[in-house]
UniProtKB/Swiss-Prot annotation:
Region Lipid binding: start-end pairs: 66-74
Protein name: Apolipoprotein C-II
Keywords: Chylomicron, Glycoprotein, HDL, LDL, Lipid degradation, Lipid metabolism, Lipid transport, Secreted, Sialic acid, Signal, Transport, VLDL
Signal peptide range: 1-22
Main location: secreted
InterPro entries reported for this sequence: Apo-CII, ApoC-II_dom_sf
Propeptide, chain numbering: 23-28
Sequence similarity: Belongs to the apolipoprotein C2 family.
Coiled-coil intervals, chain numbering: none
Length: 101
């Protein structure tokens, strides 16, 4: 029974080996045509432009001046605080690196 099992296993492996060899695709040496690349580029560009236009329309439709003013104020306050804390942190790092004199 061991011999039959080995013979069946060898036959299965042989068949699988031939199947794998037959499934290989030939290598294509030709490059994609420039016309195809330009078509893809043009279609992606048109999709991008339409998405930008839709986003701009949505922004204009939902624009609220009060919210815009609050966001600008929040941004200016947060950047001022960040610059202050960045300066403090930089001074601390420099004093640690420099050491005590």
């Amino acid at each position: 029974m061991g011999t039959r099992f080995l013979l069946a296993l060898c036959l299965v492996l042989l068949v699988l080996g031939f199947e794998v060899q037959g499934a290989q695709l030939p290598q294509q040496d030709e490059r994609p045509s420039p016309a195809l690349l330009s078509q893809v580029q043009e279609s992606l560009s048109s999709y991008w432009e339409s998405a930008k236009a839709a986003a701009q329309k949505l922004y204009e439709k939902t624009y609220l001046p009060a919210v815009d003013e609050k966001l600008r104020d929040l941004y200016s306050k947060s950047t001022a605080a960040m610059s202050t804390y960045t300066g403090i942190f930089t001074d601390q790092v420099l004093s640690v690196l420099k050491g005590e004199e």
